[in-house]
């Protein structure tokens, strides 16, 4: 191996473990230069004389307010730091003033040692006042850090000023203290801003344009790839219109998380721009509507990708050669409803609609490309960043160079908008005309139609969102052209966005991201880029958030209180002295006057009691909401007072000062976290940082040979600061890196500046500070109100389950049969959007907690296996929330025909399905939070959803009986077992779940059913049904994973402990003669060892969509052992039981000429078994309401091969026992 190849290998290995891009390298360079210059200023005596009594604060503040971020982030950090300095300095001077008053008039004449000897009591009282002020400051510091991590940039400088000022001698004046803790701080902040603007400036507005273009590139690519994947079923077809083959499913699924992070980063950078002065033609706020549209576009693209995933399952592409990333990405449960749909029908429809979809896709892709070009020109982004689409064979996309200043003049935006509108209308018309050519069987509600509707609705909404983007781009282009006509000098303006409206001011004051940690605040960048490193701390979700978002009882109670408070007693008689206006006062509320003394006193007492009770309720609510703030406030106060109590005791104060007690408190405050983290791991990292920094400072000082060579000393410190800034800016270990960098300069300056300590003593005292201060912080955080990551993980997963239940209830409208004007109001959608955002943040926290749990000590065995289960749980919850977002936005945009027109008929079925889902999710929520097993019985949402689909299909047949019968004559004859067999009502009507339809007025309905089912609202319901099937399937999988984590309650004894009828059915088949004569011996059934062994026993042959006996298992959520039948058939007394062929029953083989088992016996045997996943295709087909005999290949209806698979399994078990 040559030297060059070895170096290349070493370089790749280095970049793998320590990734670094160009932006990070520039930021490290800026920060290192800034801190080095600050250290050089401390070495110059003339500059040090102007810095006051604490010149070592200059390098420290240069690290805290570092320039290694964008301009907006630096200004943001500077504003927060200055705010903390001002209030901290004022608070410290006030506390010292009161302490000096206790010393009397001699406070400025005597030293602290003399005060200790001459005025001990006064000196002790003054230190007691300082201690009280210190405790109040520490509690406020912890409270503010717990309220919002944004405020860490304010309260940390406040702590530094107050803590260090209280350590200074009490005989120093207020002017000396103000100079010591203002000049170096303000100089360090000014230097950071200077180097941020001079050396590699990063303007947020320019970065905003680049980020928006990058996000639109990914969105554009995802749209093209997903549409190509869906309609290009046969990539080898010569009539294929695309020049590229479809990408793999794995790559398509990975794009969802990528586009989500890109769009979120756009919003973050937009909020960061409010701190900047921008000199440009167009204000950055012009991108706000585009970014909002991109967020909605992300939801529709996720819907497109999900439909591609369903199509992949339906077309059974697993029979073909799969790419490795396809196999890795397709981690789906086996019992997918879509796998039982008819692929031929879907392919037939796609083949018809292929040209229509392609035409709109091509126009939409071209408009997206033009929009990116215009935005790149408007915000001075290099045109080379814009990616064009080259997957169209007849595509003619223009390309431009970077110096194309006349770019907008070559593009007619309005013409492109008109083309897109026309293409959208043509797509709707052609789609309607093409679909009208099919028979009603294809148009009826089915899994194929659900899949197609989901794709078409998301596709159209994507085109509508592109149209909205084009309108916004047109306004930006017009604004840019107007400003350009004024010339370069007058055209550009200075934009400052912080005080433009209340929203930007609120963001500036409080921030807009609840998931920001203190590390992100110190780092100054909120894009979550940690270069592959895991977070060491996570922000904890406020306890009151769950009550605000998920507690329906609280909101209802508020309404009750409000209503009760507004009730007034009616007047029964007219008060004295008010003889006039009788008609007015007779109907008015009771008015109490001064003459009614008794009533006034009674009312005043009631009002007093009500006010007192209201005050108690408010206090109780405040304490409940502020519980985590109290907890961390007490933690900070206890830890810091344990670490620094000697500074407030007269006898130990001087000793504590000599041992650098301020360092102990400084290390202790940085080791305390209001977040959940690996406490021992974080303490270890920060201890290593302090020791390494102090050792590097010692090395630098020794290399300078006792300050004889300060140049070499400075150069060596640079090599120690570079890795520190790398860990500060490029990894989540921010506070460990801060302590390491500060320790380098603090240890050196303690020996360089006039003091009694040499360099070795300073190194030892710094190590003592991390051992004592960090140890105290560790003890307090472990034993005083500890937070455990594994408990927080369960809480977050439980919270997400509650969010899903609440979103499902908000998504459902009209569950009581009432008439609703809109199926999704704006208010409900805003609530769903808010809950969805909180749930996604909770999932991000759960992912971090999952990694942190490995660092915690555990006594219950290894955590590795449980971590894999939690990984799957988080993934499934994310998929559920993603699909609820999609269907909610689709319903808001298009409505729902079933809710708005059929709700009076189908609402009991909708209510049962929604209630089942909500019940399941609430049961999971309580199981996770309480760590209790699941109950024995849980409702089946899958069956409820199938019944809803069947009822909608039946309602359509009742609404249009004549048209459907005419269309059905051309089609095949329905199967005998089909649900849609012409009956007006099914068996569930006898249970009172469905209301009879009023036949009056329906006979006059002559509308074409094709016209109805092609309405946008009905397509929206079809699309939501496809997503609802997926949601139910994921919920069942989540239920199974929950059983692994918390277990499930099972009946150990009694009738429900095992399926007794299974033994009866087995004996009826194997020993019919003995069974008839009453000589049967009950067999001992074997119970499953684990509730998840279903996949091991269902292994009789390969899976096939055309097979009559499907072997895929469907695990019902009702119990861990038994499986609920999908289609139980009641026993009919009119059937003739004499048609049994005992020979065939005993042989288990289908005869050629003999009659088989009667249909009633087979159905009855199926209904009494406890396995639903092992059904014949006839039963599955009957449930779905499809009646295609060619598709099912059910040639012999009475064949013995149609016996339930569960019955065959029992027979196989019996043979094994005999063997």
UniProtKB/Swiss-Prot annotation:
Residues 1096-1122 have a biased composition (Polar residues). The modification Phosphoserine is found at residues 1167, 1198-1199. It comes from the Eukaryota. The modification Phosphotyrosine is found at residue 1191. Residues 969-982 have a biased composition (Basic and acidic residues). Residues 575-602 have a biased composition (Low complexity). It is a multi-pass membrane protein. Residues 1-36, 96-123, 168-183, 651-663, 706-709, 754-766, 818-1219 are cytoplasmic. This is Uncharacterized membrane protein YGL140C.
